[in-house]
Structures are given as structure tokens and as C-alpha cells.
UniProtKB/Swiss-Prot annotation:
Gene3D superfamilies: Nucleic acid-binding proteins. Part of the 30S ribosomal subunit. The lineage of its organism: Bacteria, Pseudomonadati, Pseudomonadota, Gammaproteobacteria, Enterobacterales. One of its GO terms (molecular function) is structural constituent of ribosome. PROSITE patterns: RIBOSOMAL_S17. Keywords: Ribonucleoprotein, Ribosomal protein, RNA-binding, rRNA-binding. SUPFAM superfamilies: Nucleic acid-binding proteins. Transmembrane segments: none annotated. Pfam families: Ribosomal_S17. This is Small ribosomal subunit protein uS17. Belongs to the universal ribosomal protein uS17 family. HAMAP family: Ribosomal_uS17_B. It comes from Photorhabdus laumondii subsp. laumondii (strain DSM 15139 / CIP 105565 / TT01) (Photorhabdus luminescens subsp. laumondii). Coiled coil: none annotated.
Length: 84
């Protein structure tokens, strides 16, 4: 059995929770009729053990076992810190 662990990159949009962040993942989808590429956004709740992320940071996340009702992703690393 070769299960590949899913990893994604996105931008932090909320860090108001304790040990949790909300990450927005952007993807481009082709419109079925007109063919134009449209941006679609998915928001994921991510476990941030050390509270190291801030709003605007670009982060890498990976899928894990369910940690709560909405959290099943964990923070791997901060790719780029936000300039405030």
C-alpha cells in the first residue's frame, strides 16, 4: 500500500484561535463552457502547535488524522513570513 501524504501551500487568513490557524488554498479551475480559468479558494483549519504563524504568512501544511471536528491538517513549516 503506497499512500502518499498530501501537502499543500497556502496563506494564513486567521490566527485568532489557540494552536489553530485558518489557511486559504487558491487553485485555478477551467470554466466548463467558456474555458476561462477562475480562481477558487478553499479554507482549511490547521493545527499550529507552537503558535508560530501570523496573518499573511505563506505556509506548507500536510494532511493528518482528525484532531477535532474541523481540523485534519498540521503545519509543516512557514515558507515566507508576512511583511507588516
Amino acid at each position: 500500500m503506497t499512500d502518499k501524504i498530501r501537502t499543500l501551500q497556502g496563506r494564513v487568513v486567521s490566527d485568532k484561535m489557540e494552536k489553530s490557524i485558518v489557511v486559504a488554498i487558491e487553485r485555478k479551475v477551467k470554466h466548463p463552457l467558456y474555458g476561462k480559468f477562475i480562481k477558487r479558494t478553499t479554507k482549511l483549519h490547521v493545527h499550529d502547535e507552537n503558535n508560530e504563524c501570523g496573518i499573511g504568512d505563506v505556509v506548507e501544511i500536510r494532511e493528518t488524522r482528525p484532531l477535532s471536528k474541523t481540523k485534519s491538517w498540521t503545519l509543516v513549516r512557514v515558507v515566507e513570513k508576512a511583511i507588516l
